[in-house]
């Protein structure tokens, strides 16, 4: 048969695609394993990016999340009419990113770039006592025997990453880290990153992490997941990953590493991207495991393998979260909607869009100034009111 990525590898033509003036539009679904790749493509090629609350292929048939329906036919036609027919259109004047936040009362949002302007990246420490804390962790270890009887995904595997079952039964088979209850609602939009330090009785293995929300009634449900093979742990460089602040692994044989039984290896990897509101009173949980149904262990790996996770000091295990700080970007009034971002200001009036690229953005006594060639917009805050 034909193996596209091996016989015609895209990466050999990246620059030609990027600089070939082709119009690019990436559709992504938060619960499809390919969603993260859409963001990497957007960072590499530009164009437009849509991120919705769907599973694999659900963009074309919808799902049961509120306001999740999307008129993809009209969207496709508008895009192709503009770039193939050169028909009059304001599609290239719109904010390039549109995304859906699960759990938000008004779930659809625009953005001028990804990561979002207001993304922060707090570094939380994982502790040997099973905590997720915002302070330095004491040195310690957790020893874990690899097991393969963990079932996270259903029969669709990672093609269905919308996991709604209570994970507590499977969590008993994992290494768990749990935070204190959240004092307020928390928006996560972007890529979480786990940094683990491990030694192992075998030279290779698979390491998986599941970020979960534990509700006040004790139910634990998955938010997103990520994984890394031990031999691929060596960090490299990639423009798209660099632009997102993510660890990158080439997975090339020349970069192979071997896990050591006595010297901890850094296992830094991203979890799949997501946009979600975690409610006040819930706790965050990271479940770490090294095998399970639907996953094959490395060839030659013995059945009895023990992994030791290390914490504190030079083995500072971390969980970095894409927390979105409160930030008003949408303003409505007088028949017009204005969106203000660091990259550009967008005006929407009479069903027409107009983009005004920002020459500079800076804070002043009267608010945040967005300076364009045509005007300066000022975002002011007085108490709870933002104008």
Regions found by a protein language model. Name each.
Residues 1-92:
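Active-site-proximal cap/loop segments of hydrolase catalytic domains
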Residues 58-59, 66-387:
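C-terminal, loop-rich substrate-recognition/catalytic regions characterized by aromatic stacking residues
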